[in-house]
Amino acid sequence: MIKKLLIILFIFRTSFVLQAQNAVPAYLDPAKPLEERVENALLLMTVEEKVALCHAQSKFSSAGVPRLGIPEVWMSDGPHGVRAEIEWDSWGYANFTNDSCLAFPALTCLASTFNPELAARYGQAIGEEARYRNKEVILGPGVNIYRSPLNGRNFEYMGEDPYLASKMVVPYIQGVQKSGV
């Protein structure tokens, strides 16, 4: 009798262990809420892996966590389009694609059209090029207003009018996001 009971308990315990081993971690389960998935991924990461996610591994990229299946993130800063691919250890072109990148007009030119639909199309075109070049993040557009003519980044903004900039930047970003960037 005791032997049968021990065998049943062993089978019962083994089935739970096997189920636990086959369970999908919460961070990989799309049915779970985003906050729960993020918390689970952070819980499973080492301190070194967390730092690596926040720290660049090269120009315009951040390391992933291969152990957990989290991929690298590639970015582009091009305020006038998507920057061509550059080498890891220099500013030379990496020649990953056999074409050249597009140069879009400065954002002040876009804002001067007062056309949110054009801003959305502009953003979508940049998003499509970013996708083609395997960029997941675009570091822009710059959402600021001119306060000083001496600001060396003014060319990245949509001008001095905060109302106009706010009306133009939203469709621009929505256009970029349509491409999954």
Question: What are these regions, as identified by a protein language model?
Answer:
Residues Q21-V181:
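N-terminal beta-rich core of secreted/periplasmic extracellular enzymes
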Residues M1-A23:
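Bacterial Sec-dependent N-terminal signal peptides
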